[in-house]
Amino acid sequence: MIDSVSYPSLPVPLANATGAMDDNCIYIAGGQETMVNEQSTHHFYMLDLMHKERGWQEMPDWNGPSLSYAVGVAQGERFYLFSGRSYAPDEAMVEHTEGYVFEPGIGKWSKMIGSFPVMAGTGIPYGEDKILLFGGVEEILPTSSEHPGFSRKLRVVSTSTNSLVDSLEWPYRIPVTTNVVSVGNQVFIVSGEVQPGIRTPFILKGSF
């Protein structure tokens, strides 16, 4: 038997957004409202699961470009937003590598130190003060059979210093446009794109 729970609808339709859950709050950031005349956004919403009747609350957006295909992670009662790209019907697409952190207690964003080229990648909290960022698109290259695939890097971010502290090279291709799930000391990345337009049926598993 499968149980289902109803949640409030988002204020606007969104695709290619990112999100994360911290305690009882779900955060959704960026994305685009339509697949016609595509345009990235500054949307930032929060749903308090203890007060679902209030619906999604519009939160202050980050002081930076509009974003889609960003990576969102919650850690230590904060929401972190990495990389992504901006675009509009009359503007060229621009890839971004900045990182931002939102502190719900004061309702403000701050910019992080360094560069995080992880567009369309995945991320999870690790321990009490770390974030793991898996893969991503470091550079947008022409789509062809010669495409090398996406980043194989595992990046480690310290939430104490709000900066990148380490990076490792994985022996396997890390998919993008998918999700990562942690179970105990293991992480799973299911399917996703390993080259533009090519999705994999495989599941990557890592242990820490």
Language model regions located:
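Kelch-like beta-propeller repeat domains
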Residues: 1-208
